[in-house]
Amino acid sequence: MEQRVFDSHLHIIDPAHPLVENRGYLPEPFTVADYRRRVSGLGIAGGAVVSGSFQGFDQGYLIEALRALGPGFVGVTQLPADADDARILDLDRAGVRAVRFNVARGGSADLDDLERLARRIHELAGWHAEFYIDARTIDETLSRRIAALPAASIDHLGMHEDGLPALLRLVERGVKVKATGFGRVHLDPAAAVRAIVDVDPTALMVGTDLPSTRAGRPFRDDDLRVIEEAVPAKHMADVFWGNAARFYLGSDTSGRGRAE
């Protein structure tokens, strides 16, 4: 792609580090070298390495992956509710920038710990909160809780067409959304992208979701083209780079990694 891309959602699976079986599932290895080979030519110059349910609260793999990927890449991790400040600050120095609540698969802190943990981490290190959640399960009470956080995002377009109204209400309240995981969603990605951009073009971020663990199909290069065709030209640079770079790096010019 000619467009510079911030991959807001990728996984690195390093068998040298602990993996936790999740609902009978263990993923195949997907190393930094595998990732670089797969995205070669896509214009990716930065991204967010996201911890999956099968990695639990381990950050060893994440720190190594960020070191190997270099500038422009940050981490999204899962933490127990009782994680101490020193651990959080160590992870921040290593490049971690968000805490993830994996409601769909588990392996993260519970939603009961949502406000306390997310707010404490934001006040301490400036991190935002990310949610892997089926938007159909977001009632008005949970919507208010998520929207009241200092900064938050929703993975994979909220997963389901029936959850789109709830997702758009969050977008109206300032929550970001990742256009990722097209092989695992039950909706028309192009229609969802257009709806989000219509509400707030600064809310949308793109990503590969590689290596697409447990998805109905893996990421395809054409998934990015679907987004290109759905987004007005005037918003293209922000959707593919600027929105995510500001969210994760604090600036749309901070990504120093070279395009792959």
At which residue positions do the language-model features occur?
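Active-site phosphate/pyrophosphate- and oxyanion-stabilizing loops and adjacent acidic/basic residues
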Residues: 36, 63-64, 193-194, 225
